[in-house]
Amino acid sequence: MMTRQKYAIQYENTVPGRFVRRINRFIAEVLIDGDAEQVHVKNTGRLQELLVPDARVTLQKISDPNRKTAYDLISVYKPELKWVNIDSLAPNALMKQYLMNQNYDLVKPEYTYGDSRFDFYMERGEDKYLTEVKGCTLAADLERGIGLFPDAPTKRGVKHLDELAVAATKGYYCEIAFIIQMNGIHMVFPNDDTQPEFGQALIRAAKAGVQIVCYSCHVEADSIRITDAVSDTGRYIGR
């Protein structure tokens, strides 16, 4: 279970909107007070189950004269899940808050090991740690609280898992951290229908000693907060 420490993001300058269509991976059209506006989508995943016509969305106003868009799309409302955070920067920001409160001597973001760059490298005494963070926005089984990752093929994700497996055999304490950006989901399984290679790599990593930890979150229209962490690596080995 988590401590009472609050690991959260509160977005400022937010406004409600209605989703119209996705123009490309980075841009969507929404209605704000009935007016059409092109906004930045802070997630390059498919998000097909979330970004549907007339879906309620939350936008964050960005004051940057050099930007082509004035808003970021940060969350989407889906009735059975309520609010889903789709900000791809949120998982790393939350994990950094969490790691900074775990009594490490060193927490270093964006650390290169082998041929990969991992989200975090930590030290505690003589021990060395590597953590790679993934955000989950795809719900699969609401009754059992299961989400899936990835929602689109990721060669980079497979490479990260294989590099973590190697590091684990060399004495590093390694973790793949799934930040679940929606309510009611507490476990993440590999999306074998989308990319079976990721699931195979996850099993290899687990067998090599990489810990798989799922971080549940409470999500509102303008905020996201970690509520719990569950490590059950054996569940993945036994799949």
Identify the function of each model-found stretch.
Residues 24-29:
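Short aromatic-glycine-enriched beta-strand elements
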Residues 45-58, 160:
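Short nucleic-acid-contacting surface segments enriched for D/E, G, S/T with interspersed K/R
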Residues 35-49:
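Beta-strand/loop nucleic-acid-binding surfaces
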Residues 98-115:
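A short acidic/basic microdomain associated with nuclease active sites
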Residues 181-239:
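Domain-level recognition of nuclease-like catalytic cores that cleave nucleotide substrates
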Residues 145-155, 162-194, 216:
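Nucleic-acid nuclease catalytic cores
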Residues 17, 118-151, 164:
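Conserved catalytic cores of phosphodiester-cleaving nucleases, focusing on short active-site segments
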Residues 53-64, 216-217:
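Flexible glycine-rich surface loops and low-complexity tracts that mediate binding to linear polymers
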